[in-house]
Curated annotation (Swiss-Prot):
Pfam families noted in UniProt: Flu_NP
Keyword Phosphoprotein: no
Motif Bipartite nuclear localization signal: chain residues: 198-216
Origin organism lineage: Viruses, Riboviria, Orthornavirae, Negarnaviricota, Polyploviricotina
Modification(s) after translation: Late in virus-infected cells, may be cleaved from a 56-kDa protein to a 53-kDa protein by a cellular caspase. This cleavage might be a marker for the onset of apoptosis in infected cells or have a specific function in virus host interaction.
Species: Influenza A virus (strain A/Chicken/Shantou/4231/2003 H5N1 genotype V)
Protein's name in the database: Nucleoprotein
Location of the protein in the cell: Virion; Host nucleus
Homology family: Belongs to the influenza viruses nucleoprotein family.
Length: 498
């Protein structure tokens, strides 16, 4: 990325800061996570949760969702204007699980949103601390990415289930700001744009009038975000075409789907951050760790360190495998849903298996599930090594167009070969190279055909021992060539939309 100098690092986006040096960034990210930790401790006090109950990931998620809901201004306004039966627009709540007489019981709690906002601001030195809220949203998004496959959403917008590795961040709310935009995959952006264009086709007032002007600005902004994720001139030029279209319609949808397919080989740059559940930050703050003084980074050793020393529990349904539940949460914590399983397994130090082989459902428990037989287990979230999170798509040669890993959007900056069947992907590109974008399409197809699967990505980059916090001795793993590890393929994960 030649423009690196003008971009804010994603920690800066995360903390809403202007350009800062590394120490300032570490301090402001530290301030953000310690605010989350302080808020969590206060909520546990309010709810009178025992130490064990406070470490339960399901309780953490409920508390996180309450604060996100308390600050969701647009939805709050909507709820006040459209009162629905049995929903108090001023309250928020959810299930809290408590240990009673050797059993887990579910208790539904209800709080004033105003009160939650007060506690949150108090924990964040009186500020709204939007960065911390976004951080929680990204953790929820990463958990969804690891838990559900968005096949149905892909098919609905005319894309194809093989593109699921482009769908990072597909459940992030629109209000997630620059930090949210940075972690969205190419497919997610394409899907948002296609939905918008389809609305414009069906509703002739969509682009008109004062509202239409705002819609248009949002459309162009989304196009620019997507353009910024592409790393080749031809892909970017095609995005300019889509953005400048007078009246976006089916031609633009075609172009966007073409671009999404091309991103399977010419990968876009998508940021990865390790966002942990609030209870983990709470535990660290409670034990006296000073995040702001020590500094914190979402893309370095810090989250690995934190998870080495945190004990988090989870409710387990009767026929679930606790080790599999741990894998799911580990992947979510490191935003590794679309990473090569060979790389994840090496870093984690235990085999990471594909989604279809996991005997575990999602982490959250539906309100109609029976609590009688529920058990709880410690989640194993430790790792053998740590590695730096990347935002490059893992293309082998950043200057020229080159191959990234198909069906994988790399999370860790670790050298790997690219085992891929180019023929299967190229088959999707037969046919249409007519129209205004024909020369760009031809150029993109040419680049894809010249991509060589023998190359390696992240040449020379390795993992580090957990004692090596300055990242001085990279250990470059060697992987079995023919065995690419995509998490979702050949798979029957449940759908997010259910």
């Amino acid at each position: 990325m030649a423009s690196q100098g003008t971009k804010r690092s994603y920690e800066q986006m995360e903390t809403g800061g202007e350009r800062q040096n590394a120490t300032e960034i570490r301090a402001s990210v530290g301030r953000m996570v310690s605010g989350i930790g302080r808020f969590y401790i206060q909520m546990c006090t309010e709810l009178k949760l025992s130490d064990y109950e406070g470490r339960l990931i399901q309780n953490s998620i409920t508390i996180e969702r309450m604060v996100l809901s308390a600050f969701d201004e647009r939805r709050n306004r909507y709820l006040e204007e459209h009162p629905s039966a049995g929903k108090d627009p001023k309250k928020t709540g959810g299930p809290i699980y408590r240990r009673r007489d050797g059993k887990w019981v579910r208790e539904l709690i209800l709080y004033d949103k105003e009160e939650i906002r007060r506690i949150w601001r108090q924990a964040n030195n009186g500020e709204d601390a939007t960065a911390g809220l976004t951080h929680l949203m990204i953790w929820h998004s990463n958990l969804n990415d690891a838990t559900y496959q968005r096949t149905r959403a892909l098919v609905r917008t005319g894309m194809d289930p093989r593109m699921c590795s482009l769908m990072q961040g597909s459940t992030l709310p629109r209000r997630s700001g620059a930090a949210g935009a940075a972690v969205k995959g190419v497919g997610t952006m394409v899907m948002e744009l296609i939905r918008m264009i389809k609305r414009g086709i069906n509703d002739r007032n969509f682009w008109r009038g004062e509202n239409g002007r705002r819609t248009r600005i949002a459309y162009e902004r989304m196009c620019n975000i997507l353009k910024g994720k592409f790393q080749t001139a031809a892909q970017r030029a095609m995005m300019d075409q889509v953005r400048e279209s007078r009246n976006p319609g089916n031609a633009e949808i075609e172009d966007l789907i073409f671009l999404a397919r091309s991103a399977l080989i010419l990968r876009g740059s998508v940021a990865h951050k390790s966002c942990l559940p609030a209870c983990v930050y709470g535990l660290a703050v409670a034990s006296g760790y000073d995040f702001e003084r020590e500094g914190y980074s979402l893309v370095g050793i810090d989250p690995f360190r934190l998870l080495q020393n945190s004990q988090v529990f989870s409710l387990i349904r009767p026929n679930e495998n606790p080790a599999h539940k741990s894998q799911l949460v580990w992947m979510a914590c490191h935003s590794a849903a679309f990473e090569d399983l060979r790389v994840s397994s090496f870093i984690r130090g235990t085999r990471v298996v594909p989604r279809g082989q996991l005997s575990t459902r999602g982490v959250q428990i539906a309100s109609n599930e029976n609590m009688e037989a529920m058990d709880s287990n410690t989640l194993e979230l430790r790792s053998r090594y740590w590695a730096i999170r990347t935002r490059s798509g893992g293309n082998t040669n950043q200057q020229k167009a080159s191959a990234g890993q198909i069906s994988v959007q790399p999370t860790f900056s670790v050298q790997r070969n690219l085992p891929f069947e180019r023929a299967t992907i190229m088959a999707a590109f037969t046919g249409n190279t007519e129209g205004r974008t024909s020369d760009m399409r031809t150029e993109i197809i040419r680049m894809m055909e010249s991509a060589r699967p023998e190359d390696v990505s992240f040449q020379g980059r390795g993992v580090f021992e957990l004692s090596d916090e300055k990242a001085t001795n990279p250990i470059v793993p060697s992987f079995d060539m023919n065995n690419e590890g995509s998490y979702f393929f050949g798979d029957n994960a449940e759908e997010y939309d259910n």
